[in-house]
Amino acid sequence: MDTLKDKIRSEGIVLSEHVLKVDAFLNHQIDPQLMQQVGHAFATRFRDQGITKIVTIEASGIAPAVMAGLELGVPVIFARKYQSLTLKDNLYISKVFSFTKQTESTIAISAKHLNAHDHVLVIDDFLANGHAAKALIDLIGQAGASIAGLGIVIEKSFQDGRALLESEGYRVESLARVKSLAGGQVEFLD
């Protein structure tokens, strides 16, 4: 997606050979027009898959997931990273390790929102080593739901997330595939 790549080039900040900061338009401040285009791109790629729900993880996956949900006309569920007073009973629970934060979190989805009749599109802001995606896949599996595929806004192709997911038979659609962050420069795969 050329618009996304242009935005990454102009506003993304390479913090290291493994970390790309995109808080100017994706995971702190959000560019609504760009997110609308992102949602449209995901909807175009998965429109014929019979999607009934979109699942993401709070917080950075919410904007692209909501825009895709709007385009596809389906609800969006975001896995919460902590249990609250209102999210405590009848939960699907998994653990996820954050590459960026270097911490493990517990994530949860209420069982009343996801069931075996659902066909799910997973959307997330980044794919690095696949830990967040695998945790979401675990939650969806606990519900007995099926997975149409994964929509990733930015994939760090130099990490093994895609290979891990594809080796397990999952379809991965990434809108921007970063080949390298070496020398403080973003180089795209395609």
From Swiss-Prot:
Keywords: Cytoplasm, Glycosyltransferase, Purine salvage, Transferase
Record flagged with keyword Calcium: no
Class in the EC hierarchy, top level: transferase
Catalyzed reactions: XMP + diphosphate = xanthine + 5-phospho-alpha-D-ribose 1-diphosphate
A cellular-component GO term for this protein: cytoplasm
BP GO terms, sorted: purine ribonucleoside salvage; xanthine metabolic process; XMP salvage
Binding site for xanthine: L20, N27, K156
CDD domains to which the protein is assigned, alphabetical: PRTases_typeI
The UniProt record lists the keyword Cytoplasm: yes
MF terms (GO), sorted A to Z: xanthine phosphoribosyltransferase activity
Entry binding sites for 5-phospho-alpha-D-ribose 1-diphosphate: A128, N129, G130, H131, A132
TM helices/strands, residue ranges: none
Pfam families: Pribosyltran
EC number: 2.4.2.22
Listed pathway(s): Purine metabolism; XMP biosynthesis via salvage pathway; XMP from xanthine: step 1/1
Chief site of localization: cytoplasm
Subcellular location: Cytoplasm
InterPro entries tied to this protein: PRibTrfase_dom (IPR000836), PRTase-like (IPR029057), Pur/Pyrimidine_PRTase (IPR050118), Xanthine_PRibTrfase (IPR010079)
HAMAP family assigned: XPRTase (MF_01184)
Family according to the record: Belongs to the purine/pyrimidine phosphoribosyltransferase family. Xpt subfamily.
Function: Converts the preformed base xanthine, a product of nucleic acid breakdown, to xanthosine 5'-monophosphate (XMP), so it can be reused for RNA or DNA synthesis.
Subunit and interaction comment: Homodimer.
Annotated protein name in UniProt: Xanthine phosphoribosyltransferase
The organism of origin for this protein: Pseudomonas paraeruginosa (strain DSM 24068 / PA7) (Pseudomonas aeruginosa (strain PA7))
